[in-house]
A protein has these predicted regions:
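Helix-loop-helix module between adjacent transmembrane segments
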Residues: 95-96, 116, 128-138, 169-178, ...
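Re-entrant/interfacial helical elements at transmembrane boundaries that shape
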Residues: 107-108, 140-151, 164-165, 178-192, ...
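Helix-loop interface residues and adjacent transmembrane-helix termini in multi-pass membrane transporters
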Residues: 44, 51, 70, 100, ...
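Membrane-embedded alpha-helical segments and adjacent helix-loop junctions characteristic
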Residues: 74-160, 294-369
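Alpha-helical transmembrane segments of multi-pass membrane proteins, especially transporters
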Residues: 54, 58, 92, 122-126, ...
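Membrane-core helix-loop-helix motifs of multi-pass transport proteins
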Residues: 155-224, 231-236, 368, 373, ...
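Compositionally biased, low-complexity flexible segments
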Residues: 1-20
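Hydrophobic transmembrane alpha-helices of multi-pass small-molecule transporters
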Residues: 21-96, 205-209, 215-318, 416-436
Length: 436
């Protein structure tokens, strides 16, 4: 991370009293109650008589912050970080066209056809999923690759669960490599002021070692099932890839990477590349636009408003002071262990994106904010492997598998996820402190 992080722009402290709130609640109490209720709904999602997903819970919280008078509409609009939204949108447009062209299915099949033993298939799934996720967002990779993997495994009649866990965990770990790997990395990349290349260089040993550890752990835990050779050859129907469209998509992504490596604006390059892709694709834009995760953009925008309302209560200042007091005077090792422990815990309580947002103003005030941002990116990502509900990628794999009659149990996942998470976070801290 090449230049010092900066605190976000915006108001601090409670809003002035000249407003007429729709709900007669004290701003302090209302802000705290709305924030807590929103994060409970995000974490739990299912309560008696309440069925809300994360974007819906975030939207309700954002609207409640304005309705209760915690924020004015103008303050709510100003709270939304358009750099993050624009960056996500531009990347999603390019990825959407690659999906339309069946690039991800083709890439998955190209790898799977070359393996002949269970152990090599596991390595291909973990490493291949990780590398794809480092570039094209782990959620998308899991969404597209899971059905391809299940079809391949059904042909050789082996239990698919170990490989599904390998895909989910490998995708999570590999996504730590770059700012395009997952949503929380995008937040860290923009807020920390890191360049694309700087982030990549510092996270390379973290992600590479993490993938090796993940494979080794899975190889050991499922050593009986991963021994020998497949009873039959992996056979899959050929994917009808749209070569011109895929070439254009990969070319535009390559142009974007060159722009990022040159130090140009992350969101500016992303949205320009996405817009150019719409222009040159020569396909109905609706196909790609339909694949944009609008619900994720809504979730981010809503969380920005909720967090600004929480900030207006003064609670963020209290958290900042407590965190600084806890870590102040610590060595780089102490800071890294402290931040990784907090982020791993928060990421499994309230999800990794809200956890990173919660620490947006805290990290720049820590003794070594550059190291702290890297640890936040690493630990919030690796913590997604702890439990089945730890990341959206995990849930996508589980839901896709369940649609084909394969259920991944909570404890079945946890017995693998817990050791993988502990080992990879320990490695991540060591790598960032020693090589950073």
């Amino acid at each position: 991370m090449d230049r010092p992080a900066h605190a976000p722009r915006g108001v601090r402290g409670a809003p002035r009293s000249g407003r007429r709130p729709l709900l007669q609640l004290g701003n302090l109490t209302a802000g705290l109650v709305i924030f807590a209720a929103t994060y409970v709904l995000i974490a739990v999602q299912r309560l008696p008589f309440v069925h809300l997903n994360r974007p819906a819970a975030g939207l309700l919280g954002a609207v409640a912050m304005v309705a209760a008078g915690v924020l004015t509409p103008a303050q709510a609009y100003a709270a939304i970080d358009l750099d993050v939204i624009v960056f996500l949108l531009g990347l999603m447009l390019i990825v959407g066209y690659l999906e339309v062209g069946h690039f991800f299915e083709w890439a998955a099949q190209s790898v799977l056809r070359r393996v002949q033993t269970p152990a090599r298939l596991m390595a291909a799934v973990v490493i291949g999923g990780g590398l794809l996720s480092a570039l094209f967002v782990n959620d998308t990779v899991c969404l597209v690759v899971t059905p391809v993997l299940l079809v391949a495994l059904s042909a050789v009649r082996v239990r698919p669960t170990p490989y599904l866990l390998g895909l989910a965990m490998g995708s999570n770990v590999g996504s730590a490599l770059s700012v395009t790997g997952n949503p929380q990395n995008m937040l860290v990349g923009i807020w920390s002021g890191s360049s694309f290349g700087g982030f990549l260089i510092h996270m390379l040993p973290v992600a590479a070692g993490g993938l090796a550890i993940t494979y080794a752990a899975l190889r050991w835990i499922f050593r009986t099932e991963l021994s020998g050779r497949f009873p039959e050859r992996l056979e899959m129907a050929t994917v009808d890839i749209d070569r011109p469209l895929v070439f254009k998509g990969l070319a535009m992504f390559g142009v974007a990477v060159i722009g990022w490596l040159a130090g140009w604006s992350l969101p500016g390059v992303a949205i320009a590349a996405g817009a150019l892709m719409v222009l040159i694709a020569q396909r109905d834009p609706a196909y790609a636009i339909d694949r944009v995760e609008w619900s994720l953009l809504l979730f981010f925008a809503s969380l920005f408003v909720v967090m600004r309302g929480f900030q207006a209560t003064g609670a963020v200042d209290w958290i900042d002071h407590r965190a600084i007091a806890l870590i102040d005077g610590q060595s780089r090792w102490g800071l890294a262990w402290g931040v990784s422990g907090v982020m791993a815990t928060l990421s499994n309580l309230i999800s990794n994106v809200p956890a990173v947002m919660l620490w947006r103003t805290t990290v720049p005030q820590l003794p070594d904010p550059v190291l702290a941002w890297r640890v936040v990116a690493m630990s919030s990502t690796f913590a997604g492997n702890l439990l089945l509900i730890g990341s959206v990628a995990n849930l996508i794999v589980a839901e896709r598998a369940e649609g084909r009659g394969i259920r991944i149990g909570f404890w079945e996942y946890a017995r693998v996820g817990i050791p993988v998470t502990i080992l990879t976070i320990v490695w991540g801290v060591v790598a960032l402190v020693v090589f950073g």
